[in-house]
């Protein structure tokens, strides 16, 4: 059986009060439209078409790696009109098409699979997703026949007294037999107060033709649409609970899961402990037995097993197993730190490689450098990598000891097994086995304070 999907993503999203299309706003690190696309794909649906309109180029930019096709809806004349705009996508296809909304990011791949299976096994012409809620005010009601088969969808404003008591609501997401849908769209009109073409009217057209219409009922959170910043926040809360629950089931300890913020594509190994206030973003991978103390942020990075991070920021970097980072360290993009290293407090590292067992314990800046293994950096060391026009490279070999308050003026090379005396400013290569001293000779002027009248008696 051929299955495909159309995702409606042309809405303006006026209530978002944003210059961006509504569907590219993110929930737990991923655009709403990409949540829907990815879950459709997890349900083994290969052909996906997006109906786009306002901000179409922005939507295309955010979905360019998703291997989807696009249909344009120049004017927003209702959900039925949006599907009419995708008729070219459906042309000459036979099978089943599902229609989803790009602003409902909480729909799961399990529900999508269930929708297709229910629709195809029951040989329905149309199947819709519904939900039951305590307060259905404002929603279209699902009216069923005594047998349980869907009879019609009635908008709230058109409900009679009995229909208002129904608490099963329409989600705006459907499955259709493609041929039946295309035939029904030919009979769709905009004879209503809004002058729009409603997809809900297609259900009534199908019923009148004698075809079967079914429905599956899912939890409300799965069909919740996002039309405002308030609803965006509500969706974020639901998604975050799902993400954290998944990690806890897989063996991750959260000291306080409600104050831990993890993006949807993050991977975390078992026996890792995460303290409150941590933010883990993007395509980050954290391996087994790590400890992330409070107020740490890690984005698009790989953290090896047994790493300890405390009150630190790690961006687009790799940290080797057994390394400790922080407190208050700043690991900037394109940094690779080896195994069992020590990156201490108020250390900033940018676009550099740090070898195994190297210690950079405090108050140090390293930029555009290659540092070997078993090195030790004293407090206050600075790699001076910028000459006013471009960044220069520093190379430090294995077993180098860098004394406190050393300036390494790039480009410069410090070879294996070297010592640099505290307070030195190094501008030339330091040979292997050498001690480098580059500082002014100390001069003591005896009696100077007395001569200047500054000596307190």
From Swiss-Prot:
Transmembrane segments: none annotated. Acetyl-CoA binds at residues 385-386, 422, 439. It is found in: Cytoplasm. One of its GO terms (biological process) is regulation of cell shape. The keyword Repeat applies. GO terms for cellular component: cytoplasm; membrane. Pathway: Nucleotide-sugar biosynthesis; UDP-N-acetyl-alpha-D-glucosamine biosynthesis; N-acetyl-alpha-D-glucosamine 1-phosphate from alpha-D-glucosamine 6-phosphate (route II): step 2/2; Nucleotide-sugar biosynthesis; UDP-N-acetyl-alpha-D-glucosamine biosynthesis; UDP-N-acetyl-alpha-D-glucosamine from N-acetyl-alpha-D-glucosamine 1-phosphate: step 1/1; Bacterial outer membrane biogenesis; LPS lipid A biosynthesis. Catalyzes the last two sequential reactions in the de novo biosynthetic pathway for UDP-N-acetylglucosamine (UDP-GlcNAc). The C-terminal domain catalyzes the transfer of acetyl group from acetyl coenzyme A to glucosamine-1-phosphate (GlcN-1-P) to produce N-acetylglucosamine-1-phosphate (GlcNAc-1-P), which is converted into UDP-GlcNAc by the transfer of uridine 5-monophosphate (from uridine 5-triphosphate), a reaction catalyzed by the N-terminal domain. Homotrimer. This is Bifunctional protein GlmU.
